[in-house]
């Protein structure tokens, strides 16, 4: 099953461990709690099922207007509205890497059945946006926004 790191509450220590508390995440809401319910339902039926919990997935065929939004802001020389001080950490995982891992799980019947997957190092929102703007040789002008 492809689940999500949205099963972890926003206040949990990062990086999340597979045995970390799963609970409502105020940013993800029912998406995360529905993933928890799906995981539980699967494990009730198939106790040795595999569950992969990726963070933000990026790459070809991405239908989420996330990376493209930041690139569009950079192209248009728009300032970027940064939540808080931009220190919140994000973690990404390329769709090709997810496919490689899924293939390995299927072929090798790995011993670990629940896995958080993603790039080893998280990145702050501010650093991520800065890297995206740098793809266009630009430096973002940030506007800090509080909740």
Q: Where are each of the predicted segments found?
A:
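Flexible, glycine-rich beta-alpha linker
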Residues: 52-69
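Mid/C-terminal beta-alpha module of Rossmann-like enzyme folds, strongest
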Residues: 104-147
């Amino acid at each position: 099953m492809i689940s999500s790191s949205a099963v972890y509450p926003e206040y949990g220590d990062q990086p999340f461990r597979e045995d970390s508390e799963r609970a409502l995440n105020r940013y993800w809401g029912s998406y995360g709690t529905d993933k928890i319910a799906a995981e539980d339902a699967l494990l009730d039926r198939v106790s040795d099922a595999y569950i992969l919990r990726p963070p933000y997935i990026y790459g070809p065929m991405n239908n989420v207007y996330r990376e493209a939004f930041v690139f569009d802001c950079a192209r248009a020389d728009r300032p970027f509205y940064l939540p808080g001080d931009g220190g919140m950490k994000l973690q990404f995982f390329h769709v090709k890497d997810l496919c490689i891992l899924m293939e390995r799980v299927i072929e090798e019947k790995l011993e670990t059945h629940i896995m958080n997957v993603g790039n080893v190092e998280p990145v702050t929102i501010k650093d991520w946006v800065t890297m995206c703007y740098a793809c266009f040789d630009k430096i973002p002008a940030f506007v800090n926004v509080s909740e």
